[in-house]
UniProtKB/Swiss-Prot annotation:
It comes from Edwardsiella ictaluri (strain 93-146). The keyword Nucleotidyltransferase applies. DNA-dependent RNA polymerase catalyzes the transcription of DNA into RNA using the four ribonucleoside triphosphates as substrates. This is DNA-directed RNA polymerase subunit beta. Keywords: DNA-directed RNA polymerase, Nucleotidyltransferase, Transcription, Transferase.
Length: 1342
């Protein structure tokens, strides 16, 4: 394998055995691709904005004399870039401009004569844009739109599994779900009649909808039933025989023909009888007259002479009717074929309960059901029914819906109309009846072929369409209002409804969520999340077990492990590593094609529906060198079941062992040895890890770390290869390789790094360069590490030396004992940044003022403020300190106009202001690292604001000037090359000032042209620089667009350094979580024979019952990795020659099966080997991919090479007594995370505070400054102790006895410690509740 210069710095030893057939795809593509589809111009008009516009336009006036047509749209440039939007608190969006054409037709002239056409570009609101990392900046905060898993449109056949009716009878139903429009349900009731519901309203007999579609009773019976034809000959009744229909019945008479008796009366008719009848070609048999009684007529029979109806269709025949028919001369009688087994009389029975008899009455019935209480007219009823399922404006199945609909009904074509046809409805009813008759299966709702993904783009498009439809109504009104000659398209369109709809979606939809930004993994997982909740989805309360459960079709599409614990379990899922959505929005996963028993590298993506038809081998099936299966029988999946298949039957094979799990779960090493419940916790807790001060790569990883770090976007990645020309803390400059340059550009890439910014979770985002001057860079190399990344690999925690042993009860019940060394070395120290804002408003009594002149505040409190009343940067502040001084006018009295005038003239003001300064919250302390002042346009800026502005201008100018100098240097280097190549001597050229170089002329015309081009570029560069500087200046100096009534906003950023302390929560990656119980002095920690103490002591009892053995294997492998690092470190210290070093490192990389990774250190230069050794001396990082990890023998081999006992256990000594422990202890390196549940944020105490309104009890929770609840069980405890007085004060004065507590306060102030308990308020609440039930209850004085 070829490594780039940057990759050679540290190579992770890979224990994977299976070849990597497919690279991990870009992890954010589900978000980016979907949004790209939304805003991209689509000439077909299938997707995105284009589709929305085409579906609503053209809009015609009611009279048809004019229409507004859509031509095209374009998105403008955003005003501010992403970072500016975050600082200013605005939305990162672009203006949408649409070209519309207003066409006015002549009134009197023939159809379509155009009188006037006006075209104009109209502004239609702002569309929020996605940042390159798949997020949206809405009002300054980063948000993510989570994809939704919802029921696919189409038709679904289902049953209630016998739960509805008490008899336990299974009732079947069918439901046609459109993408938008009314739902249509068909269902059987316990009496086997078929009913229909529209939009889940009350049910009507299903035949009503057929009547409304203009079918007569005869036609309905004809559609759903086969006929049995009776003939009357010579006063005998004969029946046309279809032998197959008799199977399974008991003969009620002798079946005979041509004098031969085939079946005797009372015998059951079997397949043998039927074969005989067919063989003898029997078509007519004589039946007794009684046999026809109870049969149902299939059509109307009318007496032709009189015209009266003898027998209507769907009437039961009787002997009287038979006689009448015979008299009227009917020789053939058509009846319906039904039996109890597989041809039930359902539709015939339904017709009997149907109150309607023609189209109009059916339409009226439907109208009454949809609009109860409104008087139906024929026209209204027809319109309503027409609009329900047959109007493209009101109903749309969508392409997906039509495809699913046609597939479900076994049709060949998959495209078709978005509205329903008569045929569609009839075929659905036929299929439902077939299922009731026992032919066909019901659908599985939880099958991923019946649930599809709705991503950002699609949801945004739907919202946009909603806005457009609102506009459409207004436009129709305006087009009809008359004087169109004066109007332009702009006057028709009001952009407000559109921007309101879009804004509402991005700002407050259930699926638009505040991004989880704890660390890079939590960002990526949040963007790859799939929720079944949200508009049009499920609700937590209604979702049962089945929906939440893991389904066989989840394999390779949705992770079976990563889902939240609690009420949302199984409703919120995570996309698997390789999964993607297809054009219809169904999830698909890649497989390798198997042809003639040979596994090829050809990759096919299969959706859940397609997968059902194939036999798919697992990724860990053994293959020989040619790609054939080694074993005869291979474990495969087919139709949702796993079993053994012969190798010739296999169609596909999994791509990778980790294709089952999500990104979060794929980062857990030895996942295959963990119980699933604990793995779930492990995957979820990695997302809560707080970035530490110095990131430390995991010694034991899975090989996914790099992909996550790079794709998350927290690192800075090289867009093009080149050479590092300049690097400092805030920018990296790359001189681009010649072959990657665009013709005629300077060939310089500048990367500006983010420093100390606040994340959504108040953690710190800061980038640090990880390349040095002069290093060669390739495209895709990591240039700078972000939070929680180390040399381009995800690094959520720290490698800690752990021992599994009890230690004096300090690790009872999952507590964790930590060494003081961990605190000294700042291993788990993290920086948290808080933003506090002070808003100065314009009140009725006058403006609030930000000032250092605050009434009744001492000098000491103002010592950290400048003259404008704003805290200095660098000030260390603690709870209660003033950050921004602010006074608010106090209104004792509303002043009369005369007084106002006098006040204005003599300006006495100080008397009536109150202090409303921004103070540091009680539990917070830290350092002020930044202050931002935003001033409304037209309000005078204070001194501090001007200082900040000047500083920003200086910084911007410096940045741009440096950028210009760098680009100029690059350009002049190229000009120099051209001139020298054109024959100018280099020495002379050096003496000439650079500005004069461009005046030189060259004889070679091509070179001269090149020179002129470069000169042009130089001028362009300078002009561009001036333009950029001017734009920057304008942005910085202009006033800010603040909310109405706000004059100024001051934002203060505090940085807090949090060391680890008892009460903080820590965890490993295997769901092994605990709370720190004690920080122990180093000298008291257990130590080994070399005197090395351990960092953390964990309880061994936490392992067996939880079955997460992965942590033990990780510990052993970590120990081995560290052992090898120690050996390399010793060799470096002894300054051994490079050859020995190279040989030892090569041995480490060659150890094990190594089928996937080959590292050849002979291709490395000595410097590269030394740099690799420097990076490996803290431990050799290893990767054990999920389900394909290191084997026991490999771990033992590595332990041996590192000079560690292969048992992984060593003798430890007690740090306090120096005695050795009698048994050997498992010691090794485990990757530990500090989770974002810090004791600092949870510590809380209350003195006097606020009370709840009704119960008068103290509120609960830290945010409300609440008290501790003394609950039911605590009361029992005091009762058990017999502590009556303590209990009394708990239940009265300390809680909700209002008079008692005020009295007590007075007493304490007066110095007497008396208490008089009274009536608790909650008792009064109880009395009132009892009275509200109508029971009078009174307290009587004794």
């Amino acid at each position: 394998m070829v490594y780039s210069y940057t990759e050679k710095k540290r190579i992770r030893k890979d224990f994977g055995k299976r070849p990597q057939v497919l690279d991990v795809p870009y992890l954010l593509s589900i978000q980016l691709d979907s949004f790209q589809k939304f805003i991209e111009q689509d000439p077909e008009g299938q997707y995105g904005l284009e589709a929305a516009f085409r579906s609503v336009f053209p809009i015609q006036s009611y009279s048809g004399n004019s229409e507004l047509q859509y031509v095209s749209y374009r998105l403008g440039e955003p005003v501010f870039d992403v970072k500016e939007c975050q600082i200013r608190g605005v939305t990162y969006s672009a203006p949408l401009r649409v070209k519309l054409r207003l066409v006015i037709y002549e009134r009197e002239a023939p159809e379509g004569t155009v009188k006037d056409i006006k075209e104009q570009e109209v502004y239609m609101g702002e569309i929020p844009l996605m940042t390159e990392n798949g997020t949206f900046v809405i009002n300054g905060t980063e948000r993510v739109i989570v994809s939704q898993l919802h029921r696919s449109p189409g038709v679904f056949f289902d049953s209630d599994k016998g739960k509805t009716h008490s008899s336990g009878k299974v009732l079947y139903n069918a439901r046609i779900i459109p993408y938008r429009g009314s739902w249509l349900d068909f269902e059987f009731d316990p009496k086997d009649n078929l009913f229909v519901r529209i939009d889940r309203r009350r049910k009507l007999p299903a035949t009503i909808i057929l009547r409304a579609l203009d079918f007569t009773t005869e036609q309905i019976l004809d559609l759903f039933f086969d006929k049995v034809i009776f003939e009357i000959r010579d006063n005998k009744l004969q029946m046309e025989l279809v032998p197959e229909r008799l199977r399974g019945e008991t003969a009620s008479f002798d079946i005979e023909a041509n004098g031969k008796v085939y079946v005797e009366k009372g015998r059951r008719i079997t397949a043998r009888h039927i074969r005989q009848l067919e063989k003898d070609d029997v078509t007519l048999i004589e039946v007794p007259v009684e046999y026809i009684v109870g049969k149902v007529a299939a059509k109307d029979y009318i007496d032709e002479s009189t015209g009266e109806l003898i027998c209507a269709a769907n009437m039961e025949l009787s002997l009287d009717l038979l006689a009448k028919l015979s008299q009227s001369g009917y020789k053939r009688i058509d009846t319906l074929f039904t039996n109890d087994l597989d041809h039930g009389p359902y539709m015939s029975e339904t017709l009997r309960v149907d109150p309607t008899n023609d189209r109009l009455s059916a339409l009226v019935e439907i109208y009454r059901m949809m609009r109860p209480g409104e008087p139906p007219t024929r026209e209204a009823a027809e319109n309503l029914f027409e609009n329900l399922f047959f109007s493209e404006d009101r109903y749309d199945l969508s392409a997906v819906g039509r495809m699913k609909f046609n597939r479900s009904l076994m049709r060949d074509e998959i495209e078709g109309s978005g509205i329903l046809s008569k045929n569609d409805i009839i075929e659905v009813m036929k299929k439902l009846i077939d299922i009731r008759n026992g032919k066909g299966e019901v659908d599985d709702i939880d099958h991923l072929g019946n649930r599809r993904i709705r991503s950002v783009g699609e949801m945004a498009e739907n919202q946009f369409r909603v806005g457009l439809v609102r506009v459409e109504r207004a436009v129709k009104e305006r087009l009809s209002l008359g004087d169109l000659d004066m109007l332009m398209p702009q006057d028709m369109i009001n952009a407000k409804p559109i921007s309101a709809a879009v804004k509402e979606f991005f700002g407050s939809s259930q699926l638009s969520q505040f991004m989880d930004q704890n660390n890079p993994l939590s960002e990526i997982t949040h963007k790859r999340r799939i929720s079944a909740l949200g508009p049009g989805g499920l609700t937590r309360e209604r979702a049962g077990f089945e929906v939440r459960d893991v389904h066989p079709t989840h394999y390779g599409r949705v992770c079976p492990i990563e889902t939240p614990e609690g009420p949302n379990i199984g409703l919120i899922n995570s996309l698997s590593v390789y999964a993607q959505t297809n054009e219809y929005g169904f999830l698909e996963t890649p497989y390798r094609r198997v042809r003639d028993g040979i596994v090829t590298d050809e990759i096919h993506y299969l959706s859940a529906i397609e997968e059902g038809n194939f036999v798919i081998a697992q990724a860990n099936s053994n293959l020989d060198d040619e790609g054939r299966f080694v074993e005869d029988l291979v474990t495969c999946r087919s139709k949702g079941e796993s079993s053994l298949f012969s190798r010739d039957q296999v169609d596909y094979m999994d791509v990778s062992t980790q294709q089952v799990v999500s990104v979060g779960a794929s980062l857990i090493p030895f996942l295959e040895h963990d119980d699933a419940n604990r793995a779930l916790m492990g995957a979820n807790m990695q997302r809560q890890a707080v970035p530490t001060l110095r990131a430390d790569k995991p010694l034991v990883g899975t090989g996914m770390e790099r992909a996550v770090a790079v794709d998350s976007g927290v690192t800075s990645v090289a867009k093009r290869g080149g050479m590092v020309q300049y690097v400092d803390a805030s920018r990296i400059v790359i001189k681009v390789n010649e072959d990657e340059m665009f013709p005629g550009e300077a060939g310089i890439d500048i990367y500006n790094l983010t420093k100390y910014t606040r994340s959504n979770q108040n953690t710190c985002i800061s980038q640090m360069p990880c390349v040095s001057l002069g290093e060669p860079i390739e495209r895709g190399d990591v240039l700078a590490d972000g939070p929680s990344t180390d040399l381009g690999e995800l690094a959520l925690g720290q490698n800690m030396r752990v021992a599994f042993m009890p230690w004096n009860g300090y690790n009872f019940e999952d507590s964790i004992l930590v060494s003081e060394r961990v605190v000294q070395e700042d291993r788990f120290t993290s920086i948290h940044i808080q933003e506090l804002a002070c808003v100065s408003r314009d009140t009725k009594l006058g403006p609030e003022e930000i000032t250092a002149d605050i009434p009744n505040v001492g000098e000491a409190a103002l010592s950290k403020l400048d003259e404008s009343g704003i805290v200095y940067i660098g000030a260390e502040v603690k709870g209660g300190d003033i950050l921004v001084g602010k006074v608010t006018p106090k209104g004792e009295t509303q002043l009369t106009p005369e007084e106002k005038l006098l006040r204005a003239i003599f300006g006495e003001k100080a008397s009536d202001v109150k202090d409303s300064s921004l103070r540091v919250p009680n539990s917070v302390s830290g350092t002020v690292i930044d202050v931002q002042v935003f001033t409304r346009d037209g309000v005078e800026k204070d001194k501090r604001a001007l200082e900040i502005e000047e500083m920003q201008l200086k910084q911007a100018k410096k940045d741009l000037t440096e950028e210009l100098q760098i680009l100029e240097a690059g350009l002049f280097a190229r000009i120099h090359d051209v001139l020298v190549a054109g024959g100018v001597e280099a020495e002379k050229l050096e003496k000439l000032p650079r500005d004069r170089w461009l005046e030189l002329g060259l004889a070679d015309e091509a070179k001269q042209n090149q020179l002129e081009q470069l000169a042009e570029q130089y001028d362009e560069l300078k002009a561009e620089f001036e333009k950029k500087l001017e734009a920057k200046r304008r942005k910085i100096t202009q006033g800010d667009d603040l909310a109405p009534g706000v004059l100024k906003i001051v934002k203060v950023y505090l940085a807090v350094k949090r060391q680890i302390q008892p009460g903080d929560k820590m965890a490993g990656r295997h769901g092994n979580k605990g709370v720190i119980s004690k920080i122990n002095p180093i000298e008291d920690m257990p130590y080994d024979e070399n005197g090395t103490p351990v960092d953390i002591v964990l309880n061994p009892l936490g392992v067996p019952s939880r079955m997460n053995i992965g942590q033990i294997l990780e510990t052993h492998l970590g120990m081995a990795a560290k052992g090898i690092g120690d050996k390399i470190n010793a060799m470096l210290k002894q300054q051994q020659e490079v050859a020995k070093l190279r040989e030892f490192i090569q041995r480490a990389y060659d150890l094990g099966d190594n089928t996937r990774q080959q590292v050849d250190l002979n291709t490395f230069s000595d410097d590269e080997v030394l740099r690799l050794a420097e990076n490996l001396k803290k431990g050799l990082p290893v990767a054990t991919p999920v389900f394909d990890g290191a084997k026991e023998r490999e771990i033992k081999g590595l332990l041996e090479l590192g000079g560690i006992p292969t048992s992984g256990q060593i003798t430890l000594y007690d740090g306090r007594t120096g005695e050795r422990f009698e048994r050997q202890v498992t010691v090794g390196y485990m990757y530990m995370l500090k989770l974002n549940h810090l004791v600092d944020d949870k510590m809380h105490a209350r003195s006097t505070g606020s009370y709840s309104l009704v119960t008068q009890q103290p509120l609960g929770g830290k945010a409300q400054f609440g008290g501790q609840r003394f609950g039911e069980m605590e009361v029992w405890a005091l009762e058990a102790y017999g502590a009556a007085y303590t209990l009394q004060e708990m239940l009265t004065v300390k809680s909700d006895d209002v008079n008692g507590r005020t009295k007590m306060y007075k007493n304490i102030v007066d110095g007497s410690h008396q208490m008089e308990p009274g009536m608790p308020e909650s008792f009064n609440v109880l009395l009132k509740e009892i009275r509200s039930l109508g029971i009078n209850i009174e307290l009587e004085d004794e």
